[in-house]
Amino acid sequence: MSDQKKEEEEEAAAAAAMATEGGKTSEPENNNKKPKTSGSQDSQPSPLALLAATCSKIGTPGENQATGQQQIIIDPSQGLVQLQNQPQQLELVTTQLAGNAWQLVASTPPASKENNVSQPASSSSSSSSSNNGSASPTKTKSGNSSTPGQFQVIQVQNPSGSVQYQVIPQLQTVEGQQIQINPTSSSSLQDLQGQIQLISAGNNQAILTAANRTASGNILAQNLANQTVPVQIRPGVSIPLQLQTLPGTQAQVVTTLPINIGGVTLALPVINNVAAGGGTGQVGQPAATADSGTSNGNQLVSTPTNTTTSASTMPESPSSSTTCTTTASTSLTSSDTLVSSADTGQYASTSASSSERTIEESQTPAATESEAQSSSQLQPNGMQNAQDQSNSLQQVQIVGQPILQQIQIQQPQQQIIQAIPPQSFQLQSGQTIQTIQQQPLQNVQLQAVNPTQVLIRAPTLTPSGQISWQTVQVQNIQSLSNLQVQNAGLSQQLTITPVSSSGGTTLAQIAPVAVAGAPITLNTAQLASVPNLQTVSVANLGAAGVQVQGVPVTITSVAGQQQGQDGVKVQQATIAPVTVAVGGIANATIGAVSPDQLTQVHLQQGQQTSDQEVQPGKRLRRVACSCPNCREGEGRGSNEPGKKKQHICHIEGCGKVYGKTSHLRAHLRWHTGERPFICNWMFCGKRFTRSDELQRHRRTHTGEKRFECPECSKRFMRSDHLSKHVKTHQNKKGGGTALAIVTSGELDSSVTEVLGSPRIVTVAAISQDSNPATPNVSTNMEEF
């Protein structure tokens, strides 16, 4: 220790003498001194000696070109950074600089003159330049020694006055091949592809060998950008450097592979497998600053967990388990430093699928205020591992060869629905029904198969998929020669029941036709051999005395069936039979039938059957409701001839009174919302409750004005408009002309309650002449 102290004192004295001489060359005997390692600096030199040595280096930039080269050793086991031929320790710590700046802190700054990397703290460099306006030339310090593992330190002084250092590593292989990394040329390392290998030396160091030694793996250095990292070197206290300990939680990273299929991008997870069993790897990356996405250089440290076997991830040794940790590099530049901490074994940086992990290094000269950034990305299999923005250790499981999952994507095809031909449908009860295309039933030939009952059912398939039946039921008919039903597109039921004859008159009870919609016209029917019923000639109805009176109509369905068309469920209802009186018929034959002689039965929805008793030979009347006023006093021969009949609306809360049944029926349709009168004008289709409303509406289409003013010959569509117009003439003349409007019926106060049948309106214009007792009266008759 005393010899070392003496040497340090001599170096300090020599530095002071050099400072007094004004920057002369240093003593050449210090150039051949051996480099010293860490751990033996116990005494600190005086600040005066340090200042003298620093000033001598600033004053003589070109005199130390022949000094010994600096070799920096990074010891991961102790966490120290050393200069090999200088008795000091360097430490890499972060500073509060703009960007990703690092500084080197010298723990024991020596006083010798060959310390080429020692600078006072006042001249430390950063990424942000000071405001000095002096422009000085760039100063460069480099060494020419070929010692393996050395670094070349280049001092760069910016025009602003700040000092920066570029540290260029000089690598040498085992065979003595020199590898020079030039930061100014990004294409100089393109030829190094596949020529650098990392071999564990067993002493916590790495040896770079040529690719022709083994066939393990390759370390690629590609895409070097022109970037430099400002390095600040100042004396300080040695603090052990933590290389692999990073605070924060561990985040799981899942590697996915984007695949574009048919315009759709899918992210498929990559499953890694080794031939006979693989090892897990851990890749840790330091957190990047908010300004950049990467850190200032990465260090790939291989730490095999199983040191008894080979640490290669090749399929030849499937039992190996390797942990790969990428932490922040402690090198002086942004170039990647590769250190293997394996005691035994060999690390190959290629995966089992022969896909190479590419380490991209980038360096740019720091000449502006922009941040110096180094883009170093570890790309296994062409995929990038996204870096977390927090100080967390990202853990990636790397297990052998990636195997892509096979995903089969089938293009969607449009469903083609074809028309289903008539086929059999299996019902729950086991019966099979053959569907038949829906078509009008034109002609049905019926023959007597049962003397008591004949039931004919024709199935049709509705558009909604349901099967409806057209039914014609004939009871108590012994023989039936021919029956034609035309335009019967809906389900219907016809029942003919013969009754006994009395007094030479045969009565037949006919059940009404049950439909679910439009009117049905029954044209002709041939009935023969019916008991107590003679042949009916439709052409001779007038002479035969056949009278078809009011037939009550209801909506019903065939027994055992329910029709669900349009969401309406129809239930079977009880129908009172209608009596048709037939008299004076003696073997009439069927002849020509004219349209005005056909018996037509119009069926309308909304009409209900009253519960009146049907008696043969009595005239039936249609009633709107079952109130006592509607049922009592029917006909003109009532008990009180002078009493006016009143028809009261039975709807709760209404109570309106009408003198005629037609008025009450129209009023009830207004309650139920039924509008059976539809305008058939093109593109109109409006519906009305009463027929007179429809007629009045049609005049708006035709433009017909039926009502003319007797004074000015103006014409109006409605009579109430004419009445208002006549009053204007009366007011102008001051009562000189009196108009009397007399109707043939009683008018209601409401316009909407006008009678549905035409009325005779008499308009009498009375004018005065010289003799007021004999006025002239002109009468105009208008029908509307």
UniProtKB/Swiss-Prot annotation:
Biological processes annotated in GO: regulation of transcription by RNA polymerase II
Modification sites for Phosphoserine: S46
Domain comment in the entry: The 9aaTAD motif is a transactivation domain present in a large number of yeast and animal transcription factors. In SP4, the motif is inactive.
Short motif 9aaTAD, span: 467-475
Protein's UniProt keywords contain Metal-binding: yes
Ranges of biased composition (kind: Polar residues): 37-46, 109-120, 137-150, 291-301, 346-356, 381-390
Organism: Homo sapiens (Human)
Matches recorded under CDD domains: SP4_N (cd22536)
Record's keyword terms, sorted: Activator, DNA-binding, Metal-binding, Nucleus, Phosphoprotein, Repeat, Transcription, Transcription regulation, Zinc, Zinc-finger
Zinc fingers (C2H2-type), renumbered ranges: 647-671, 677-701, 707-729
Family designation: Belongs to the Sp1 C2H2-type zinc-finger protein family.
Tissue specificity remark: Abundant in brain.
Function: Binds to GT and GC boxes promoters elements. Probable transcriptional activator.
GO molecular function: DNA-binding transcription factor activity, RNA polymerase II-specific; identical protein binding; RNA polymerase II cis-regulatory region sequence-specific DNA binding; sequence-specific DNA binding; zinc ion binding
Main subcellular location: nucleus
Residue stretches of biased makeup (Low complexity): 121-136, 302-344, 364-380
Region (Disordered): 1-68, 109-150, 281-390
Record InterPro entries: Sp4-like (IPR039938), Znf_C2H2_sf (IPR036236), Znf_C2H2_type (IPR013087)
SMART domains according to UniProt: ZnF_C2H2
Encoding gene, per UniProt annotation: SP4
Protein's name according to its UniProt entry: Transcription factor Sp4
Subcellular location: Nucleus
PANTHER family given in the database record: SP4 TRANSCRIPTION FACTOR, ZINC FINGER PROTEIN
SUPFAM superfamilies, per database record: beta-beta-alpha zinc fingers
One cellular-component annotation, GO: chromatin
Pfam families referenced in this protein's UniProt entry, alphabetically: zf-C2H2
